[in-house]
């Protein structure tokens, strides 16, 4: 699935942790448009696996800082039949013709990545789709089903799928992409990829050892499977994470030992804007889990976290101080499962371990589905932690909350494509969330340009701003909560 073109970003002052992270990764941020082909360019003349004029041959002749031009090919796919293309230089750029125009693929059972970069520096892959890379090691760790790099990785305008890693009893990471340094993804779809091992596992689709920037992208259908410890069903970031206008959905971390972060696991500062994390599964933190660390922080603005599952904190397992603005956290659930012990104290929406500031946010309809009659609050935690903020709508909380908190059913519609590049929960007419929120300095709601943050007397609570003139009064109870 190709996401729409990047949306213009609202002019907002960066929050402190977002500013620090933006400075740290500014040099590696991916451009939206294709970069012009720089000097010292090697042109690929055919789609053969090897030999003169092939991509493999061009890489073999490249030096540090070179670019390889694949835009002049008349063919649409390159099949690698003799193993991975080995990259031994720094700062290499592979420039393709664009999304869906050229596919680099393996056989799915070769035991090798597609691109294996030992050179370090920044590897850039622009406008090239990747599929059926399969990294397998029986005697050592295995990393990067489609791309492995010792350095930083920048991928732009690409569809990546059916990449796998298997490491027998050794560690495995990055079912599709693995970078020991930082990683930048812009207008990238990664899906139906994963890793399996009897050892530790990190990042069902993405492993970014030094941090990640994810923009206008979708990571979906990834699986992290281990009998030991697994972190990050979709994405593992060993540093900070900055994510904007992206979807992390339908990923699974089903490790039998200790599985954290069905969608995302982040070890550093976590900044998420205008994004949706939905229908992911793990034992701890169905949508998002982080390292237990009070020196870093989580910030979530104008985003939706919905339909995720875990035995502990199926929405967010907040092992860092957390700030949430103008967001919707709903319909996350704790399943009754022999392999997934339930910890009701942490809440079905958010489990707090450090301080929390929540403003103009809906946290509701987060539940346990079992037959024993036990319930979990939308907000919980290991110890009492007073929640700061204002203008929120919750259905229940085991933590002290601001005095102006509204306790009511927000009457949310099902998660759907309501415009913009990510899915949202619309609110029905008559919802207590309408005109009761704060705009937070945002010009638009989660959907971006064209969806004003204030359409009525004041902003609505949550990630979605209803249009009072377009809401059907007959849908007040259409969600079945009448």
Predicted feature locations:
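N-terminal secretory signal peptides that target proteins for export/translocation
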Residues: 1-13
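Bacterial N-terminal signal peptides
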Residues: 16-28
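Acidic Gly/Asp/Thr-rich repetitive segments characteristic of extracellular carbohydrate-active
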Residues: 46-69, 460
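C-terminal accessory segments
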Residues: 51-56, 398-465
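Right-handed parallel beta-helix
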Residues: 107, 119-258, 280
């Amino acid at each position: 699935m190709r996401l729409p073109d990047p949306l213009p970003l609202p002019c907002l002052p960066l929050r402190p942790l977002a500013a620090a992270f933006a400075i740290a990764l500014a040099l590696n941020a991916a451009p939206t448009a294709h970069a012009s082909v720089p000097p010292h360019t090697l042109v690929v003349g055919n789609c053969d696996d090897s030999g003169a004029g092939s991509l493999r041959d061009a890489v073999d002749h490249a030096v540090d800082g070179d670019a390889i031009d694949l835009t002049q090919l008349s063919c649409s796919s390159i099949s690698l039949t003799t193993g991975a293309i080995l990259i031994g230089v720094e700062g290499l750029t592979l420039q393709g013709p664009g999304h869906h125009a050229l596919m680099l693929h393996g056989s799915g059972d070769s035991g090798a990545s597609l691109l294996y970069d030992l050179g370090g520096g920044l590897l850039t892959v622009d406008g090239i789709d990747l599929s059926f890379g399969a990294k397998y090691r029986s005697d050592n760790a295995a990393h990067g089903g489609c791309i492995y790099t010792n350095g930083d990785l920048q991928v732009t305008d690409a569809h990546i799928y059916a990449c796998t890693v298997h490491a027998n009893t050794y560690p495995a990471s990055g079912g599709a992409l693995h970078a020991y340094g930082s990683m930048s993804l812009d207008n990238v779809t990664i899906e139906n990829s994963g890793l399996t091992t009897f050892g530790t596992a990190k990042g069902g689709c993405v492993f970014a050892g030094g941090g990640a920037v994810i923009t206008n992208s979708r990571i979906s259908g990834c699986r992290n499977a281990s009998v030991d410890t697994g972190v990050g069903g979709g994405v593992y970031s060993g540093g900070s994470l900055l994510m904007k206008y992206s979807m992390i959905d339908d990923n699974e971390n089903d490790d039998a030992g200790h599985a954290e972060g069905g969608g995302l696991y982040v070890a550093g500062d976590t900044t998420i804007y205008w994004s949706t994390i939905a229908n992911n599964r793990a034992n701890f933190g169905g949508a998002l889990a982080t390292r237990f660390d009070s020196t870093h922080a989580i910030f979530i603005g104008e985003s939706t976290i919905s339909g995720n599952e875990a035995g502990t904190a199926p929405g967010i397992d907040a092992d860092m101080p957390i700030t949430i603005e103008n967001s919707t956290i709903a319909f996350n659930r704790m399943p009754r499962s022999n392999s997934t012990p339930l910890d009701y104290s942490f809440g079905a929406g958010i489990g707090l371990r450090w301080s929390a500031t929540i403003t103009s946010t809906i946290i509701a309809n987060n539940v346990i589905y079992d037959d024993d009659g036990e319930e979990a609050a939308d907000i919980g935690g290991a110890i009492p932690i007073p929640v700061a903020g204002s203008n929120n709508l919750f259905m229940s909380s085991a933590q002290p909350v601001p005095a102006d908190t509204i306790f009511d059913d927000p009457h949310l519609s099902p998660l759907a494509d309501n415009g913009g590049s990510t899915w949202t929960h619309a609110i029905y007419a008559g919802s207590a969330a309408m005109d009761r929120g704060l705009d937070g300095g945002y010009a638009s709601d989660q959907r971006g340009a064209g969806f004003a943050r204030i359409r009525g007397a004041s902003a609505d609570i949550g990630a979605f701003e209803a249009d009072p003139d377009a809401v059907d009064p007959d849908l007040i109870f259409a969600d079945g909560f009448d």
